[in-house]
Amino acid sequence: LPREIFPLSTLGTSAVNSAIQLVILLGAIVVTGAIPSLAQLAYLPLALVVLVVYATLFALLLSALNVYMRDIQHLIEVITFLAFWASPIVYSYSYVQKALAVNYPVAHEIYLANPVTLAILGFQRSLWAAGIDQPYPVHLMIRLAVAALIGIVLIFGAHRVFARLEGNFAQEL
């Protein structure tokens, strides 16, 4: 049994939970009649790919590091907390755009370099009918594709780290 199955099993659990939530969301979309167009739905697969790719990347990398450095588990909590607040989950992207785009364009681009932010914006663009009139980053689809490609390349590096460290897992645990 490959050892990669252990960190990736957490992704499977999250996928099942997310699928249940997606079914509920789709039901709400149908009930409210706010059915997105095909152009909007085009963002959904790419947003999902970005989310899965980076979840896989961090699952492999951080699980391997956690075996050797137990405090990584606390760092994961901090990273999750920061990723939550650094993404337009509880606030609108329009606030960020107003605050950063004109006066601080470099900070705005750094904000948009966060793959979680791009995935959230992709989900909002595809499934949130009220979000149609909201501002979105220029070339969101291209940004999502680039983030996905970068993540796929980084997965190979994360797997290499995992493979290099897995030989001593039993000793360390």
Could you say what each language-model-derived stretch is?
Residues 3, 8-79, 83, 140-160:
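Alpha-helical transmembrane segments and their short interhelical loops
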Residues 63, 117, 163:
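Short alpha-helical basic/polar micro-motif
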Residues 87-141:
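Short hydrophobic, aromatic-rich alpha-helical segments embedded in or entering the lipid bilayer
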Residues 82, 89, 122, 126-130, ...:
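Hydrophobic alpha-helical segments
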Residues 35, 92-98, 168, 172:
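Juxtamembrane helix-loop transition sites at the ends of transmembrane segments
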Residues 71, 163-173:
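Short cytosolic juxtamembrane segments of multi-pass membrane proteins
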